[in-house]
């Protein structure tokens, strides 16, 4: 209770708390203002580079090792982890799906991604050696909160990836990685998505470090790629906006869209589809590109916009060729092809009607600026 001369803290039963715990909220009220942008979503998309940069800040110690000071789980417990289960909803779940590919590749332990609202109703297999990672921007997602409580009851450690200090999910978890993305006011998550992927990647590299699954120079190389993300995201925002505007103007009357991707491009396709559903109220479906011939191709009509998340050809020739084959299939049905691809990909230029380019990078690092193109579009602007 706040009065003119004092503040009284009580519990839910009305009992006064004599010495309540306090903490400082590191938050600037101006961060919740538009600051000259037309919308909060537009502003927050452009804050993506800074969100990634802040999430990485201070993670590398002087000795060259990853340093996660805020993680309150003993290193011995991390070494014993033999399975990871990510629990989340919506955009956070897609961030977890992206991270699954990287963590399994780096740490060589299985990673499951569960929708939090389904998790506790299916009798999941949990042990003290299972690490449950709860991802939530707000830290108050009730489905995720209930799921993490269930996991702790079963004896598993829970680590939260969260953007809001002092929220319920980080408070009730065994450990927390804060994303430091700043307030996200828009309904549709943007900068929090890339910050969540960044934090999950840092967690994966830390696990690889404590388990000895990667050499130090390999971890350093992956971290260097992560540190380069803000610059490359900014490149996309600076160079591709007009192409997106022009394409959106041409497709503004489209009644439905398909988003397709493979590997880490699959969850990004799902996230891109979610953005159009949330903001443009347009019927949009995201699929794994390999599922195209198993049903979704029946939805493709003349002029239907189909967005392909194209992996780089370098080192992923088979994956790249499969996606190009999918583009050819829907092109034969008269679809309008929008491709998100690496710079100067000649196969994409040959078949796509419009291309949103991204800089060259390793496959596991290519989803940040792909997200930019899926999110930063007048299709998602309110009329």
Give the location of each predicted region:
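A SIS-like phosphosugar-recognition module
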Residues: 1-383
């Amino acid at each position: 209770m706040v009065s003119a001369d004092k503040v009284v803290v009580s519990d839910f039963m009305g009992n006064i708390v004599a010495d309540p715990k306090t903490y400082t909220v590191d938050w600037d009220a101006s961060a919740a203002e538009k600051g000259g942008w037309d919308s909060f979503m537009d502003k927050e998309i452009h804050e993506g580079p800074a969100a990634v940069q802040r999430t990485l800040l201070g993670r590398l110690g002087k000795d060259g090792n990853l340093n996660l000071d805020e993680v309150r789980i003993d290193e011995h417990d991390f070494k014993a982890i033999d399975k990871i289960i990510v629990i989340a909803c919506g955009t956070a779940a897609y961030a977890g799906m992206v991270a699954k590919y990287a963590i399994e590749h780096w740490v060589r332990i299985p990673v499951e991604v569960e929708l939090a609202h389904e998790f506790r109703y299916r009798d999941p297999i949990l042990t003290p050696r299972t690490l449950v990672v709860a991802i939530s921007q707000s830290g108050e997602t009730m489905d995720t909160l209930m799921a993490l409580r269930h996991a702790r009851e079963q004896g598993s450690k829970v680590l939260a990836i969260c953007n809001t200090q002092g929220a319920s999910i980080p408070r009730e978890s065994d450990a927390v990685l804060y994303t430091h993305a700043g307030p996200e006011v828009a309904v549709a998550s943007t900068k929090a998505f890339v910050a969540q992927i960044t934090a999950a990647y840092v967690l994966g590299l830390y696990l690889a470090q404590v388990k000895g699954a990667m050499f130090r120079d390999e971890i350093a190389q992956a971290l260097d790629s992560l540190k380069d993300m803000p610059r490359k995201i900014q490149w996309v925002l600076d160079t591709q906006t007009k192409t997106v505007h022009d394409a959106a103007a041409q497709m503004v009357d489209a009644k439905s869209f398909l988003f397709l991707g493979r590997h880490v491009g699959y969850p990004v396709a799902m996230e891109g589809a979610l953005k159009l559903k949330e903001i443009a109220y347009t019927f949009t479906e995201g699929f794994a590109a390999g599922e195209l011939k198993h049903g979704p191709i029946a939805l493709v009509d003349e002029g239907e916009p189909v967005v392909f998340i194209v992996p780089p050809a370098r080192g992923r020739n088979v994956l790249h060729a499969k996606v190009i084959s999918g583009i050819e299939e829907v092109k034969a049905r008269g679809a309008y092809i929008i491709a998100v691809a690496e710079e100067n990909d000649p196969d994409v230029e040959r078949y796509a009607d419009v291309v949103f380019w991204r800089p060259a990078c390793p496959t596991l690092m290519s989803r940040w600026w792909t997200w930019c193109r899926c999110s930063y579009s007048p299709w998602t602007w309110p009329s």
